Curated annotation (Swiss-Prot):
Protein keywords: Pyrimidine biosynthesis, Transferase
The keyword Transcription is annotated on this UniProt entry: no
Protein name: Aspartate carbamoyltransferase catalytic subunit
Family membership noted in the UniProt record: Belongs to the aspartate/ornithine carbamoyltransferase superfamily. ATCase family.
Protein's organism: Brachyspira hyodysenteriae (strain ATCC 49526 / WA1)
Subunit and interaction comment: Heterododecamer (2C3:3R2) of six catalytic PyrB chains organized as two trimers (C3), and six regulatory PyrI chains organized as three dimers (R2).
Length: 359
């Protein structure tokens, strides 16, 4: 049994194994594939709205022969009555062979892991991480570009709150990626992520426009500006239309084999006139969520046995009840946690939401 909480907890070999298993399952005989998780139950608990992630996990479960329980509206669950996340996870575990959870609180998935032995897949926790999106992004990059080694990726839009950006950066770090973060200052990439990149000697630049790097990059990764992450509506209004791309500013101005990805949903950041160009891979990317999530579920439950060694985390974790995470959207402010702190050579970080302590 294993959990998929953070892409940081996977080794390069484990990532490659997930992608290889996803490819095998995508090409497998459907009748044989339905035997893999026959008799198992997946419970999906979504505390935030979702279309692609929730439906692709459901599709993945059915294709593996797995039954599904769950909710996608916490208003229709005991959460509305005041039930804690701790109690929700404990109860759901009693009915499940695997839990898929999305939550609005940063670090919720890491906390859930502490209170159950049931395998958990993090389907997005606030502005923190989204490992299943990262793995399907890596799968798409490998399928479309032939490799995920040494790719130059420009992240455009909301790099501050974009959990898909944060997780994909962590994933591509293993493969010597090079990054461009293109955002208005108010939604630019957080310093705690840049500290990780600096420590790993990964090349990156913060820029205010994407045009200057179109001839260099292998992938243009667009994101929407997320209204739900802003406390100040005025900040959102100032930046919500910061970047828009169309045929006029892409075709003939980028590398011939560059691809455009987007975790979706899009608002107006990608004009539909790009949809039928060779650069647009975002709908293929969304489709790739099914085989990737099949692989994650099968490996998490040991329905398919992993053949690679589990990554050993080489940092110290301590419990410190006196430490307060500076992120007011961290699970430590909503649940009774063990208040763990990760001690690294370049700083102390919240075990749950990854924010630097003391910043």
């Amino acid at each position: 049994m294993r959990n998929f909480i953070s892409i940081k907890e996977l080794s390069k070999e484990e990532v490659i194994e997930v992608l290889d298993v996803a490819k095998e399952l995508d090409n497998a005989d459907s009748k044989e594939r339905r035997k893999i998780m026959d008799g198992m139950i997946m419970t999906s608990i979504f505390f935030e709205p979702s279309t692609r992630t929730r439906l692709s996990f459901t599709s993945a479960a059915y294709r593996l022969g797995c039954k599904e329980l769950g909710f996608d509206n916490p208003e229709q669950s005991s959460v509305k009555k005041g039930e804690s996340l701790r109690d929700t996870i404990i109860m759901v575990s009693a009915y499940s062979d695997i839990i898929v959870m999305r939550h609005s609180i940063d670090g919720a998935a890491k906390f859930a892991e502490e209170v159950t032995n049931c395998p958990i897949i993090n389907a997005g926790d606030g502005a923190n991480e989204h490992p299943s999106q990262t793995l399907l992004d890596l799968y798409t990059l490998r399928e479309e570009l032939g490799t995920i080694e040494n790719q130059k990726v420009a992240f455009v839009g909301d790099t501050r709150y974009g959990r898909t950006v944060h997780s994909l950066v962590d994933g591509l770090m293993m493969f010597n990626g090079q990054f461009y973060f293109i955002s208005p200052d108010v939604i630019q990439i957080p310093d705690y992520i840049l500290k990780e990149l600096d420590n790993a000697n990964i090349k990156y630049k913060k820029l205010s426009n994407y045009e200057e790097v179109l001839k260099e990059i292998d992938c243009l990764y667009m994101t929407r500006v997320q209204r739900e992450r802003f406390d100040d509506i005025n900040e959102y209004e100032e930046v919500k239309h910061a970047f828009r791309i169309s045929k006029d500013n892409i075709v003939g101005k980028c590398k011939d084999d560059m691809i455009i990805l987007h975790p979706l949903p899009r608002v107006d950041e990608i004009n539909i006139d790009l949809d039928d160009t060779k650069y647009a891979k975002y709908f293929i990317q969304a489709r790739n969520g099914v085989p990737t999530r099949m692989a994650m579920m099968a490996l998490a439950t040991d329905a398919i046995k992993s053949k690679v060694k589990r990554k050993e985390m080489n940092y110290e974790v301590v419990e410190n009840k006196e430490v307060v995470c500076p992120n007011n959207k961290c699970v430590t402010h909503f649940e009774e946690t063990k208040n763990r702190v990760v001690k690294k050579g370049y700083g102390d970080f919240c075990y749950y939401c990854n924010r630097e302590i003391g910043k």
